[in-house]
Design a protein with these regions (language model features):
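N-terminal "arm"/small-domain region of PLP-dependent enzymes with the aminotransferase-like
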Residues: 1-66, 145
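Short glycine-rich anion-binding loops that position phosphate/pyrophosphate groups of nucleotides
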Residues: 33-36, 80, 106, 153-157, ...
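Short active-site oxyanion
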Residues: 47-50, 72-73, 97-99, 221-222
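Phosphate-binding glycine-rich loop
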Residues: 56-98, 116
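PLP-dependent aminotransferase-like
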Residues: 93-151
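Active-site pre-lysine segment of PLP-dependent enzymes
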Residues: 114, 121, 132-145, 157-180, ...
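PLP-dependent aminotransferase class I/II
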Residues: 204-246
Length: 246
């Protein structure tokens, strides 16, 4: 069993996911218990009376092309907040596991962890050195109960990138030991290129991406979790069946 699976909660490995109604336009969808008529004013192509496709194939493929990854390594989520929640539910056991984050940073990492009953370990960024991450301090503080390590780069709210050398050192040291999550919500506004090609190097690495910022689609709530195909399959066991809207 690879580390992506062995780090997960045992229950997730055996849970039977919700079986959503088959999504084929050619079907007469009596099995989905949907209203057969459209509501007044509905001008959508798919029809608001119908459940949406859980993972729209066209959207998955377009996002995979945009981020330079294969479709099997991408899950479309209801904003990147949902991806954070999914990772917490997959990997964190209440009262046993922990996350690590570099503060100050985006608040949802710790919110999702605390909802799951996990400990939150904080490694302060070094303000005197441009809010850089202290790699040695982070690695010294890590212990096997830390299942998720969040690295927001560019960081919210300090706006700085954490540095390729620092991120690479953390990924190398924790490969196979923890899920390292690099949040690239603001990467389009950075001088640094996305590090998503590292997925081929580090199986326990994951990325968060979103269309909310540079693409000005915050109201559409379209995010993505990028990771090893086994991680994406675990997430598909946990994600609500119709979290994306038509």
């Amino acid at each position: 069993m690879n580390a992506v699976l062995s780090l997960a909660r045992p229950e997730i490995l055996t849970i039977k996911p919700y079986s959503h109604a088959a999504w084929l336009p050619s079907l007469t969808r009596l099995h989905a218990n949907e209203a057969p008529w459209r509501p007044t004013g509905d001008a959508t192509e798919a029809g608001l009376n119908r459940y949406p496709e859980p993972q729209p194939a066209g959207l998955v493929q377009r996002l995979a092309e945009l981020y330079g990854v294969s479709a099997e390594t991408l899950l479309v989520t209801h904003g990147s907040d949902e991806a954070i929640d999914l990772l917490s539910r997959i990997y964190l056991r209440a009262g046993l596991d922990a996350i690590m984050q570099c503060t100050p940073t985006f608040g949802m990492y710790q919110v999702a962890a605390r909802i799951q009953g996990a400990e939150v370990m904080e490694i302060p960024l070094d303000r005197s050195r441009g809010w850089s991450v202290d790699v040695d301090r982070l690695l010294a503080a890590w212990h096997p109960r830390v299942k998720l390590v969040y690295l927001c780069s560019p960081n919210n709210p300090t706006a700085n990138s954490l540095g390729i050398a620092a991120l690479e050192a953390i990924c190398q040291a924790l490969d196979g030991k923890a899920i390292v999550v690099i949040d690239e919500a603001y990467i389009e506004w950075s001088n640094s290129a996305s590090l998503t090609p590292w997925l081929a190097r580090f199986p326990t690495l994951a990325f968060l991406r979103t269309l909310s910022k540079a693409h000005a689609l915050a109201g559409a709530r379209i995010g993505a979790l990028l990771g090893h195909p086994d991680m994406i399959q675990l997430a598909k066991r946990v994600i609500p069946p119709y979290s994306l809207t038509t």
